[in-house]
């Protein structure tokens, strides 16, 4: 145990350890009862919870909160009281964000320009660590684990949470090497395995048929829509659990946009997707849930159908109807 722990923290730590121990016993008993049923989904959730509570119970540092013990495992992310400032606290960009983002759903982030959508989505895989003058408070949990804790290294987080940017970002390499480079940088060296993953990733991004005969030609020779699908292929090559998409079709023509939207419908079968979009029509076409941001705050979150047909917040309605923007 670490030194210089105040008595109140130590007392809380011991109390929580007792609670975790009892919770493990309770969950193990529930697991035994479930083993005689066909409820496999619930059994998976119980196993996940047991695993997390055991990690919590073994934690020997009362001053570090690595996991969220009441995490809802229907969510891929849970955000608690998250704030972010730019320019050494000169600009308060995100204000008291509390939000749960569901697994295996497409969640659209909508709102006026400058409302915090892109700032928020880049927070989910710690892109702001690369920006000077940024400060943060609050917590972001990914599958119960605090993304800023020592137990979730930055490189591991970014392999699990892929990112696709507004404009296609191919490397100045061949189509093949655009994907292989990411694999090699994460320690995958076997050429047969790399070849397999490159093919699977391009197929997953609906690009294989377009490029299978030109794999070793420059990626810059592809059309804008093909380059964006290559960016998606590169993101899914590492088998992430989440895809973050920051206005992925804003630089594309309608035909290429339609192909990306069709691809999103396919990808959500395997990944949780968070997409920033300025297109209300696109949000309705591709998303299951919608979050409305306004002036750095989340004003409303619900199913996409509810947000677009019966919004609870007057500003949400004004934005959807085009009265604010």
Curated annotation (Swiss-Prot):
List the PROSITE patterns.
ABC_TRANSPORTER_1, ABC_TRANSPORTER_2, PSTB
Its keywords, alphabetically, are: ATP-binding, Cell membrane, Membrane, Nucleotide-binding, Phosphate transport, Translocase, Transport
Which of this chain's residues are annotated to bind ATP? 111-118
Quick check: keyword ATP-binding in the entry? Answer: yes
Instruction: Give the family per the record.
Output: Belongs to the ABC transporter superfamily. Phosphate importer (TC 3.A.1.7) family.
Q: What does this protein do?
A: Part of the ABC transporter complex PstSACB involved in phosphate import. Responsible for energy coupling to the transport system.
Q: Which protein are we looking at?
A: Phosphate import ATP-binding protein PstB
Q: Organism source for this protein?
A: Mycoplasmoides gallisepticum (strain R(low / passage 15 / clone 2)) (Mycoplasma gallisepticum)
Q: Print the organism lineage.
A: Bacteria, Bacillati, Mycoplasmatota, Mycoplasmoidales, Mycoplasmoidaceae
What gene makes this protein?
A: pstB
């Amino acid at each position: 145990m670490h030194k210089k722990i105040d008595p109140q923290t130590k007392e809380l730590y011991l109390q929580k350890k007792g609670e975790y121990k009892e919770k493990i016993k309770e969950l193990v008993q529930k697991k035994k009862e479930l083993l005689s049923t066909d409820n496999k989904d619930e059994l998976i959730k119980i196993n996940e919870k047991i695993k997390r509570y055991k990690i919590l119970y073994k934690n020997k540092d009362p001053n570090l909160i690595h996991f969220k013990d009441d995490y809802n495992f229907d969510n891929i992310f849970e955000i608690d009281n998250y704030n972010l400032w730019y320019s050494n606290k000169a600009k308060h960009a995100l204000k008291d964000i509390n939000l749960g983002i569901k697994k295996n759903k497409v969640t659209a982030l909508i709102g006026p320009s400058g409302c915090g959508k892109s700032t928020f989505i880049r927070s989910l895989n710690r892109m702001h660590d690369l920006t000077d003058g940024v400060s943060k408070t609050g917590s972001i949990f990914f599958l119960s684990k605090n993304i800023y804790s020592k137990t979730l290294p930055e490189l591991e987080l970014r392999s699990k949470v892929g990112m696709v940017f507004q404009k296609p970002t191919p490397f100045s390499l061949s189509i093949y090497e655009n994907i292989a480079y990411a694999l090699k940088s994460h320690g995958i060296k076997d050429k047969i395995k790399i070849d397999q993953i490159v093919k699977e990733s391009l197929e997953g991004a609906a690009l294989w048929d377009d490029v299978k005969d030109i794999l070793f030609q420059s990626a810059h020779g592809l059309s804008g829509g093909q380059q964006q699908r290559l960016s998606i292929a590169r993101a899914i090559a590492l088998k992430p659990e989440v895809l973050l998409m920051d206005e992925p079709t804003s630089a594309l023509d309608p035909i290429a946009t339609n192909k990306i939207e069709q691809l999103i419908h396919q990808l959500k079968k395997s990944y949780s997707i968070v997409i920033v979009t300025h297109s209300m029509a696109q949000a309705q076409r591709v998303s299951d849930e919608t979050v409305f941001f306004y002036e750095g705050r989340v004003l409303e979150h619900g199913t996409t159908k509810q947000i677009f047909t019966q919004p609870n917040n007057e500003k949400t309605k004004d934005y959807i109807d085009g009265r604010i923007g």
